[in-house]
Amino acid sequence: MSKIRVYELAKELNVSSKDLITLLMDEFGVEVKNHMSTIEDEEAQLIKELLATKPEYIEGSLEDSKSLVDEYEEILQNELNKAKKKRKKNKREDKDDENEELETEVIEIGETITVKELAEKLNKPSNDVIRTLIFSGVMAAINQEIDFATAEKVCESYGVILEKLEVTEELEAVEAEDDDEENLTKRPPIVTVMGHVDHGKTSLLDAIRKAKVTDTEAGGITQHIGAYTININGEEITFLDTPGHEAFTAMRARGAQVTDVVILVVAADDGIMPQTKEAINHCKAAGVPMVVAINKIDKPGANPDRVKQELTEHGLVVEEWGGDTICEEVSAKSNLNIEKLLEMVLLTAEMLELKANKERKAKGTVIEAKLDKGRGSVATLLVQNGTLHVGDAIIVGSTYGRIRAMFDDTGKKIKSAGPSIPVEVLGLSEVPEAGDRFNQVKDEKTARIMADKRKDKEKSDSLMSGNRVSLEDLYSQIKEGKVKELGIIVKADVQGSVQAINQSLEKLSTDDVKVRVIHSGVGAITETDITLATASNAIVIGFNVRPDNNAVAQADKENVEIKTYRIIYDAIEDVKSAMIGMLEPEYKEVILGSAEVRETYKISNVGTIAGCYVLNGKLQRNAETRVIRDGIVIFESNLSSLKRFKDDVKEVNTGYECGLTVEKFNDVKEGDILECFMMEAIKRKEL
């Protein structure tokens, strides 16, 4: 006996499969699991007849407000559909009998999916899927997104079950996983060294790590965040090496978010400086305790008491003065009191009672990330809870992967890392953003699905925000007509540097000149970057990276400027100079001279000629001139002609008489003062 599938019957009756399933189970007692289930042809015929006599069973099939014409059109369409079904009936019945016992194909998607991706999942040509959408009343291009309901209709027509992915709840569960108190054990403190430029942050870390890195770093400024673990008296301390320059405010603030204790370095001879104040404010905002290290106390002119006094002005009262701020006088150069400083750090950490659960799934933060030519995506992760193992699947922001290899801060291969331990990992699909959170998940498939969902959300958010910003900018530029824009493409060796440069450049924007970072990324400057710069009329900035040969050739051909730097401060200063060069000059009024009208003459076809006596300075032909009567400016124009006797002259000096006419002004009267002036352009020297 022949059978028919539920979705086919639903099509014939012009109702949704969901409504028909409810109808079959509730009203007719026919057991069906989903729209791919089959029912006997006899049952289907009975249902058709019953519904033909009682159309009220079809929920929402006909509305009371429908016109008679609409009803006839619908009936006609149903008849046409039935005719098509009859032509293919025999083939379908045979096929149904053969496939009845086969497992129905199921595919999973998120809230939305592009037409191209859906076609790939269905293993059908994109054109077929687009055609199906058109028959469903949806006009969509190959790269256009469609929602779950629309995709479900398409899958239904191909006999495929579509299920919605629900991965958000799982990720939230991972993030919100609570730890039992009995599973918590003591963990090492995570310490960040902060302070003003050249106050000795890197030198202090040198003294702590017994490794000289200062001399190898350009300009004496730490170029990007590294992470190191040291052992003191049997206890471990993890140091985050954050850049100390003012341009790295964002990176320093991010460092404070994963930090337990901050060592605030203040030079004994300099005292509190702008970046020191910045560091203090970041620590207070993050609620991170500080241990003050007064450095360079062995230097001539050192005055630790003055530093302590200045600290008091910023709400940090040292212990010896009755406060609660731990302060240690040290010298990174001579290793003076370094051990004491570390003991104070451990004491502060002990008061915080830092604990973590080693037995749970790992989670933490990306400290740094870069693209290595030989190893691919390399990320420095700081494990903040749980234990990370080689082979674990992780999701990092909108990136995912399985850890192929893991290295400690000395470059040694390790198999696992517990809380507060920084590790360098290989195996991520892309370079993550520095500061991204990472979570261990059950398998790589789950990680990929989560990452894809996050990417889709970021993409839609950026498209929405991008459209809004563009429209607002376009409106304001049209309205003002004066806004200039400097387009920049940023490439750097590590993600942290990219973020720092981007944030510093954004701060340079003013009402007159806007800085727009068109593209930024990690890696060498490529031909693609030059092509983008050409199209966007932008300059290319490289930090610790070089352009490849193709990029250089393309840049020469297209006249694109490539500038490379080793110190970020220099890059920011150069961009600032370029912006200043784009500014309109300021104008200053310079008085050339003034004259009194002694007599007036009216000449036909010429107008009123003023006979004047130059009181001071000089009058110049074509100079801007204002007419002043009784101390009030009544007109501004140019001197259209200037004569001495019958001769045309360019200028007339003090004490001489002359005849002149003011352009478009014939109401000159005796006693009027004519003041000549010019607007002198002054090149702007600052934003």
UniProtKB/Swiss-Prot annotation:
Domain annotation tr-type G: ranges: 186-355
Cited PROSITE patterns: G_TR_2, IF2
Which Pfam family is an annotated match for this chain, by its short name?
GTP_EFTU
Q: Which key words tag this protein in UniProt? A: Cytoplasm, GTP-binding, Initiation factor, Nucleotide-binding, Protein biosynthesis
Cite the residue spans of the region called G5: 331-333
Q: Where in the cell is it found?
A: Cytoplasm
Q: Which residues does the record give as GTP binding sites?
A: 195-202, 241-245, 295-298
Q: Which segments carry the region annotation G3?
A: 241-244
Region span, G2? 220-224
What are the GO cellular component annotations? cytosol
Q: Where is region (G4) located?
A: 295-298
One MF term from GO for this chain?
GTP binding
- Name the source's superkingdom: Bacteria
Region of interest called G1, as start-end residue ranges on this chain = 195-202
Q: Which family does this protein fall into?
A: Belongs to the TRAFAC class translation factor GTPase superfamily. Classic translation factor GTPase family. IF-2 subfamily.
Q: Which PANTHER family did the record assign? A: TR-TYPE G DOMAIN-CONTAINING PROTEIN, TRANSLATION INITIATION FACTOR IF-2-RELATED
- Protein purpose: One of the essential components for the initiation of protein synthesis. Protects formylmethionyl-tRNA from spontaneous hydrolysis and promotes its binding to the 30S ribosomal subunits. Also involved in the hydrolysis of GTP during the formation of the 70S ribosomal complex.
User: Know the name of this protein?
Assistant: Translation initiation factor IF-2
Species this chain originates from: Clostridium botulinum (strain Eklund 17B / Type B)
What high-level taxonomic lineage is stated for the organism? Bacteria, Bacillati, Bacillota, Clostridia, Eubacteriales
